[in-house]
Every structure is written in C-alpha cells, then in structure tokens.
Amino acid sequence: MSWNALFRRNLFIFNFRHRSFATKKAANPVARPNRWRSVIGLEVHAQIQSESKLFSGAEVSFGAPINACVALVDASIPGTLPVLNRRCVELGVRTALALGCEVAPVSAFDRKHYFYADLPAGYQITQQRAPLARGGLLTFPVFVPGVTKKPYYKSARVHQLQLEQDSGKSLHDPVERKSLVDLNRAGVPLMELVFEPDLETGEEAAALVKELILILTRLGSCSCRMEEGALRVDANISVHRENTPLGTRTEVKNIGSVRAVAQAIEYEIARQIDVLDGGGRIFNETRNWDAVERKTIAMRDKEVVQDYRFMPEPNLPPLHVHVEGDYCEGDDVVSAVKIRTDLPELPEETRKSIVETHHLTPEMAIILVNDITLHSHFRSILDEPGKTRSPKVVANFLINELLTILNKNKVDLEECHIPSSHLAEIVDMLETNRINQYLARLILQEALEQGASGQSPSQIAADRDWLMITDEAKIEQLCRDVIQRNPKVVEKYRSGKDKMLYALAGDIAKLTEQKADMARTVELLKRLLKK
C-alpha cells in the first residue's frame, strides 16, 4: 500500500492537540432544517504575556497564593494612579499587525462602570471609543478529517482590538453564605479581539479560534492556555430563515476549549431553531456553556440595555504609537514600523511553504501546522544535520503512526516524551526497510511507555526481535511451506482468482507476526506459483 493510500486510510479525527473539536455531525449551513441560516460572531479575550500587570508592577502568576500578586492600584487604594505597561502596548501592536489591522496613531482609555465585588474601583479601564487598532482580516482553514471532505478557507473581519484590564475573582461559599475575593487577577493585561459576525457554523468558529491560538503563540503575545483562563471565548449567535432579517442574538460565555467552541455554538443554534419552530421567541440574553451537561443555560437578560456610563479615563493620557515613516528611536515611543519588521512567519505562510517546498497535500500541511509540537517534530527530523529524509515519509509517519498511538493511549502530544531523535531513528528504519508500519507502531508503543530516558528504537527492535525478515532464502522457504499446506487456495489462484495470492501472503504475515517483507513475499509467491 502506498504512503498516500495509507494516509487516506488511517486519517482520523484530529483536535486542538491531536483529538478533534468536531461535533458528531458535520456542520453544514445548507443542511439546516427549513433553510435556517446561522450567524456567528466571536469576542476573544487574550491575556497578554507580560510579567507584570497592565497598570501596575504587580506580578502576573497563575496559581499564586490568594491575594499575593496585588499592588495598591489593583486594590483601588485612594491616591494611587495607573501607569501603562509598555510591553503590553508593544504586544498589542504586534498582534494587530499580524491580523492586518490598522493601528491607531492615537488611542485612548475609558472607564466602564459596573459593580461587582471583584472590581474594587467600580469600573474597568478599557478602550471603547478609541481602540488600539481597527479593521483587519483573519483567513483560516476549516478542516476536520472525517467530517469535512476537503479543507476550505474562511475569513472573518476584525472589528477592533483593544487593551483592557481584567477583574478579580469572586469565590462563593454557599455553606457559610459568604463571598471571598481574590484580586490576583485584577489588573492582568488583556487584549479583546472583536470579530464581525462572518461565521456560519461551530466548526468555522472553532477553526478561527485554533488559528488565532497559533498566531498568538508564534507572536509570543499570549500563552493561550485556555485551561488557565489565558484565552476566553464568547460567541454571539443568531438564526434566521433565508432572505429574512437577522434574528435576535444570544451571547454564550464560559467556553473553555477549542472543541467546546464548536459544541456550544452548534447546541445553541439547534436550541434556537427548536424554539422558533415551536412558535417561541428568542430573547436577547447571556447564556453559560455547561461543559458537563453539554448545553447552554440562561444567565441574565439583556433585553434592558445596561448603561456602563463610559467616560474618558482622566488618569491616563492618550496613547501615541508611531505608525508610519522612518523608525523612531526612543524609550517613550512605541513604533509599529519597527515592530512590523520583527513579525515571525505566520501559520498560513508555513502551510504554503510546506506544500510548495515538500510537495505535501494541503490536508497534511494543515494537520502538521495546527499542532505546535507536531510541527516541531517535523522540522527537527527534516532539518537534522547530515541527514536527508523524505518529507512525505516523515509526515506520514507522524500523522499515521505517532498520532494513532497517542490517540489509542489517550496521551496528548505535549505529554509525549519521545525525543525527536528517537522519532527520526524510526523514520530511518522505515526508509531502509528494516521495519514496516506495524513494527513501527509496536516500537512507538514501547518507547511511549519507557519515556524520554528509555532505550533507542534500534535497541527496542533488537531486544524484542521487531525487525523485518528480509532474507530471501528464509522468505522463499516460508512461501513453499504455505503453498504446500494450502493446495485448495493454490488451485483457486491458478484458476484465475488472483485474490487468493493475498490469502497466502496473509498466512505468511501471521506466521511471522507481521515481520515478513510483504513486497518480497508477494513476488516470491507469484514466481513459485507459476511453476
């Protein structure tokens, strides 16, 4: 079987790490009942990767003891003033440029007023009126193996990118009937990215979030650890029949993973369609995604618009960014011109390079690039000094063999401690015909169990006799024995039933525990059966 055929046969559902964010059924706007159409817009809060907070020198540390990372200004002690963190501005500009946004030469901060116990000032500092950047476009591939037949590209416009501070965290104790407040998160720097409602399915929304994660990680502007709350996604969803006005939207919050983005949106679309088909009404409300029950739950009504009483922040001057002309030196100047020259290669550029340089399929390029660890292994194996390896063999091995073993063991790629050098050694053994795909998986399974300090693949194969039988004399004797033991099968083959040849080859594979060289085995069987 060819590598491409093996790739097609073994392609499995692939997610934010190596498992898919696919829902059970393919999301297809054309297939919605009664010609319903869905409209989806995302709001993403990304925690800026900075050592200190947006307006104070307090440390940003996930998992720190309660209230251990709080400056006086974070607790809104009277007499304290905010001081803008330059690093956060630079990373915000860097992100805006990567998304094709137009960076504003002058932006401003506002106060957004609302009352929560974990917001001691009674307002949040944000950029509502004059954000750091506007416009922009994010184009991304939508491809879920086993769900979408072929990848296609979708684009979502970026409405604006703004800087803002996070609130603290309230901890409710229903037994003691008390609420406790942790201000470690208060003042943590955030970028809010608001996308236009250009999406139609949950899969498209999940693909957008995945692409955004790849971009932010490459830029170094956000860790994107959703399990730590470093990236939070809110989805605005509405449905309407074709050729009718847009429906009433709901906002779904608390979406904590890429896979949950697709699940939450598809659930909410189905819920709204059911309500409208039953003659009901959709309310403009905020709903929470329950990952355990896999459904959205009403939180609060938005029918009455809340007045946040936005006003200019009097304690912060306008933010000036140098956006055109020659690079402007100086510690007090953030230069978008200079930042643009330092942008890394973005994921889509990497995919195009893989397809054009290594002649891999777009599907393979998407799977390789969509996982940072997988792409790192691919590059390490190909770029090893003094070695020339086939990109197709390397890609197929990583996708079909490594990911299959990890998926079988429910191990994430980041938790896999097999070194790239060991993976490269298995590729070499495949290319030199010392092992086949079956033996490669046995070796991978053993290497996974042994971990980083385990034996090399060559040692594992030698100790367990997991090397292919390539000796022609030995294979010929096996062929003769099988032919002699199966006279009826031989007779059928000689009468024109060519498939019987593979029945004989299958017997040899069983006898040798899949270690016989099948190409040589088939050749020898054909030659012996002609006599």
Curated annotation (Swiss-Prot):
Spans traversing the lipid bilayer: none
Superkingdom field: Eukaryota
InterPro entries, per the entry: Asn/Gln-tRNA_amidoTrfase_suB/E (IPR017959), Asn/Gln-tRNA_Trfase_suB/E_cat (IPR006075), Asn/Gln_amidotransferase (IPR018027), Asn/Gln_tRNA_amidoTrase-B-like (IPR003789), GatB (IPR004413), GatB_Yqey_C_2 (IPR023168), Gln_synth/guanido_kin_cat_dom (IPR014746)
Keyword annotations: ATP-binding, Ligase, Mitochondrion, Nucleotide-binding, Protein biosynthesis, Transit peptide
EC number: 6.3.5.-
Coiled-coil spans in chain: none
Gene Ontology molecular function, alphabetical: ATP binding; glutaminyl-tRNA synthase (glutamine-hydrolyzing) activity
Enzyme class name: ligase
Protein's GO biological process: glutaminyl-tRNAGln biosynthesis via transamidation; mitochondrial translation
Subcellular location, principal: mitochondrion
Compartments in which it is found: Mitochondrion
Gene3D superfamilies with a match to the protein in the record: 1.10.10.410
Transit peptide, residues from-to: 1-21
Keyword Nucleotide-binding: yes
Quaternary context: Subunit of the heterotrimeric GatCAB amidotransferase (AdT) complex, composed of A, B and C subunits.
Functional summary from the UniProt entry: Allows the formation of correctly charged Gln-tRNA(Gln) through the transamidation of misacylated Glu-tRNA(Gln) in the mitochondria. The reaction takes place in the presence of glutamine and ATP through an activated gamma-phospho-Glu-tRNA(Gln).
UniProt family annotation: Belongs to the GatB/GatE family. GatB subfamily.
Protein's name according to its UniProt entry: Glutamyl-tRNA(Gln) amidotransferase subunit B, mitochondrial
Species, as recorded: Culex quinquefasciatus (Southern house mosquito)
Native organism taxonomy: Eukaryota, Metazoa, Ecdysozoa, Arthropoda, Hexapoda
